[in-house]
Amino acid sequence: MWRWIRQQLGFDPPHQSDTRTIYVANRFPQNGLYTPQKFIDNRIISSKYTVWNFVPKNLFEQFRRVANFYFLIIFLVQLMIDTPTSPVTSGLPLFFVITVTAIKQGYEDWLRHNSDNEVNGAPVYVVRSGGLVKTRSKNIRVGDIVRIAKDEIFPADLVLLSSDRLDGSCHVTTASLDGETNLKTHVAVPETALLQTVANLDTLVAVIECQQPEADLYRFMGRMIITQQMEEIVRPLGPESLLLRGARLKNTKEIFGVAVYTGMETKMALNYKSKSQKRSAVEKSMNTFLIIYLVILISEAVISTILKYTWQAEEKWDEPWYNQKTEHQRNSSKILRFISDFLAFLVLYNFIIPISLYVTVEMQKFLGSFFIGWDLDLYHEESDQKAQVNTSDLNEELGQVEYVFTDKTGTLTENEMQFRECSINGMKYQEINGRLVPEGPTPDSSEGNLSYLSSLSHLNNLSHLTTSSSFRTSPENETELIKEHDLFFKAVSLCHTVQISNVQTDCTGDGPWQSNLAPSQLEYYASSPDEKALVEAAARIGIVFIGNSEETMEVKTLGKLERYKLLHILEFDSDRRRMSVIVQAPSGEKLLFAKGAESSILPKCIGGEIEKTRIHVDEFALKGLRTLCIAYRKFTSKEYEEIDKRIFEARTALQQREEKLAAVFQFIEKDLILLGATAVEDRLQDKVRETIEALRMAGIKVWVLTGDKHETAVSVSLSCGHFHRTMNILELINQKSDSECAEQLRQLARRITEDHVIQHGLVVDGTSLSLALREHEKLFMEVCRNCSAVLCCRMAPLQKAKVIRLIKISPEKPITLAVGDGANDVSMIQEAHVGIGIMGKEGRQAARNSDYAIARFKFLSKLLFVHGHFYYIRIATLVQYFFYKNVCFITPQFLYQFYCLFSQQTLYDSVYLTLYNICFTSLPILIYSLLEQHVDPHVLQNKPTLYRDISKNRLLSIKTFLYWTILGFSHAFIFFFGSYLLIGKDTSLLGNGQMFGNWTFGTLVFTVMVITVTVKMALETHFWTWINHLVTWGSIIFYFVFSLFYGGILWPFLGSQNMYFVFIQLLSSGSAWFAIILMVVTCLFLDIIKKVFDRHLHPTSTEKAQLTETNAGIKCLDSMCCFPEGEAACASVGRMLERVIGRCSPTHISRSWSASDPFYTNDRSILTLSTMDSSTC
């Protein structure tokens, strides 16, 4: 009973079966024991809140943040005990932070609600009661038969029942799911394919058994049990039968499908990506600083409490007559009184912890992330793709990268394959001037091969090979070549998953056949660019793939139409690294054609020119070409019957289907006869070499992680500049055992130590890497850390992630960045501190799972060197400045207790306590953190060495933290004691002889403080816009206007009128004005002097770069500023500003960028500054 109650409440959900049973059209059995399964409805819910739970749920989430919870505790303490400040002083800022965050999150959730309502309310047609019924998407139930028309989006995950084609096929595009723009073909089972009308579907009696929902877009296992004439027919269902929600129907008039997954159980919904939980180095530093300041806060409270009781213990200090304690108070527990006073001091000093820091940082990250998407330099016009920010929490981490791990294919290369060469039966052919011609024989070629080559001199007349879709059939003199290598070309034309589309008219006939079309009217689509390149090459030679259906593939060989019955497709997977098809030739012969990596095909071969082909494959790889080996096998009728039976059993299995299929595939793909190999070229992307060189100059180590073979990977690394010709290349490949691997690693470590070479490169393959990581991680890491570039080839996806994790947890704890474009790169993208997805041709899995997405690898340089640099500088200054201004704020409060005998009297008015962080000092730092550009973006991008100035979290080091903290304490001492010396003892500064009181003294300290911290922000600003001027000087003006207004009126709703006429009285004193100016100048003068001497004696590369940007009349030749002859009086001021700020207002600045500029050179050591045009002051 108790378990049932817990299940009903949702605490103990009932055990869920591994499979679900779906009755098509919801025709449930009328007799027998049947328990219907419960399925969710088809509503999509991306929102987090409802009207009823928004307030409690949002408050709970916000108070899980330590800082918010801390200030809540402070507020409750103020309510419970007698504290020196009003609860409003803590409650109002906390309320402001909570409210701003709640409004932001509420607005975002409201947008999600609107989006959900639009999707859930979309009209759909469902087959019910023998007719089509129009309803809304949210009303679709599991088991409903849904009709979808051309160009409509599937509202749920549907199993295809039929289409307007006789073979039951349809074309869809999944661009919105995985970004693949090619058309994919889905097929219905033969028994339902003929049910093309509502009336026919009404007679269908079928049950679908399939797996429970999972997020993998490409995985689906099930079976359909169809009852016809009291006989049950079982058909397997796979990914080719499933139409995913979010995909769009193309080139097909209409289809019918049965809903198997609905609502939040669809694959699209299960792939909704939650916000990244990665934490940046800045956030970790900020939390460390918070802990340090919390220790300072507790220390100040403890010291004040102890000193208070020490003073009270002295007999000469009697209680004042106005503060006499009652008998009950005197007899109360000293421990309780100590705790009460400690809490009161804690409340008094609590503003040293900046409550508004978190909300400011959150706003800065959110608003700042838009600049990446708006950057036209990161926009790729050809593909119409702009940079995307999937998480704004890591903006500043882009400025701290020390290691870049990159995929090769589609990331460094274009992933646009061009057929270049091939090896057929031990003979090489290459494309020269667009024609396929034979190369010379291999050294061990037989005489027969030589004579054969001499007899093929007519090959110069082969049809022209182009990269367009215009294919020409071969002339008659090519017949001999094609007949001689018939099986090779047939394998290329049949062993693939390429789809075909008529580019002139939609394919909406009874089948897929395009045999009546000219080859120029055909357009191929493929998820693999390699397959498309090979099929196009075969078509240009004269064997044209025309189309396919579920059971047939059609090929034109020299104009003659041939139809092959497609028996089975053995799909590609990353473990086997190959794919195969089993076809029945027109002669009735049953053949298997296999295609895959040389390491997966050659070990399975027992015949053919294996050694010659292996040599050719290595030669292709040395040229940087991608290679595939092609083989075949013939089956006898008995062998095929056994294979067909095993495949059917594996495909219809609901449990462990993938493992069973893998075992069957291994059984089938053996005893192959090698036909040859192909080589296609994948061109490097634009400016890849320059980008890698820039990363190296910035002090970033680049690792290439690829699945390609060793020779191909090394060749591409050399061509893209990852390896230099002068670099000492070390190799850790083909290791067979742990001991052999360990010995090789020790030899490499000795070579690195002994070789007097500046740079080393390391090549390691996947097998050797597994051995190295198993027992010798430390030795392997020692070798890697001493190499400038590392290339890992033959890598599996999980190996890529493991390598990155190994670097992440190394003693140096470097910041890592992974960049890739394919689904096999997702694991390493998620493992790295920062994941970059390339929006390439292998889908959008990488882009969807990344933190940032860009269209080209070359954009990485600006993303890191400009945006990363700016974001880090901005947020590092923001964090330090917040702690600095709060130290300035609270330290006078602490010092004041020594003069009021620790009576917990507050120095500032409660309104000032409340508004200091919210209104008076918040906007200048926020605008700075959004707009600051301490160096021109062109300089940062073209001088990558400047990136080193901010590496290793340098601006948030303990040294820098202590500087800002000490600066805050020193300024606070000047505020307090400067004001104290001004007022003095029994000194009258007013014309009527009155003296300043407690509130006037506190207001004077507060006024100097507001002006000083605001001007300090102005000194840190290098890039001035009208917005900076508005918020900087406007904040000071607002403070004065507010204080005059607040102190000039008696406010009836205030309990006390402490500030009435105080500010006006303060400003009426000339001495006060003089003191304010003197203290502000004194505070900032020390800071200015330090900046001047630092820039003069120890200028950083960034500070030198700042001096290349000239103000009117200033010519910057080196780290010293020189002025033209006849300098005017403003020169000294200009010199000082140039020393302090480094850059001037953009309204006066004059930049001169040209190809001869030093920032366009590759100088790695020194910065040579060019002469720039100057004008008189």
From Swiss-Prot:
| One cellular component (GO) term of this entry | azurophil granule membrane
User: E.C. number, please?
Assistant: 7.6.2.1
For this UniProt entry, what is the primary localization, expressed as one broad class? membrane
Q: Spell out the subcellular localization from the entry.
A: Recycling endosome membrane; Early endosome; Endoplasmic reticulum; Golgi apparatus, trans-Golgi network
Keyword line: ATP-binding, Endoplasmic reticulum, Endosome, Golgi apparatus, Lipid transport, Magnesium, Membrane, Metal-binding, Nucleotide-binding, Phosphoprotein, Translocase, Transmembrane, Transmembrane helix, Transport
Which cofactors must be present for this protein to function?
Mg(2+)
Per the Swiss-Prot or TrEMBL record, the active site comprises: D407
GO biological-process terms attached to the record: aminophospholipid transport; monoatomic ion transmembrane transport; monoatomic ion transport; phospholipid translocation
The answer to whether UniProt assigns keyword Transferase to this entry is no
SUPFAM superfamilies cross-referenced by the UniProt entry:
Calcium ATPase, transduction domain A (SSF81653), Calcium ATPase, transmembrane domain M (SSF81665), HAD-like (SSF56784), Metal cation-transporting ATPase, ATP-binding domain N (SSF81660)
Q: Which residue ranges are assigned to the Cytoplasmic compartment in the record's topology?
A: 1-55, 105-289, 360-876, 931-960, 1021-1025, 1091-1177
GO molecular-function term, one example from the UniProt record: ATP binding
What catalytic reaction does the record list? ATP + H2O + phospholipidSide 1 = ADP + phosphate + phospholipidSide 2; a 1,2-diacyl-sn-glycero-3-phospho-L-serine(out) + ATP + H2O = a 1,2-diacyl-sn-glycero-3-phospho-L-serine(in) + ADP + phosphate + H(+); a 1,2-diacyl-sn-glycero-3-phosphoethanolamine(out) + ATP + H2O = a 1,2-diacyl-sn-glycero-3-phosphoethanolamine(in) + ADP + phosphate + H(+)
- Where in this protein does the record say Phosphoserine is found? S1154
Protein name per Swiss-Prot or TrEMBL: Phospholipid-transporting ATPase IF
Q: Which organism is it from?
A: Homo sapiens (Human)
Gene encoding the protein? ATP11B
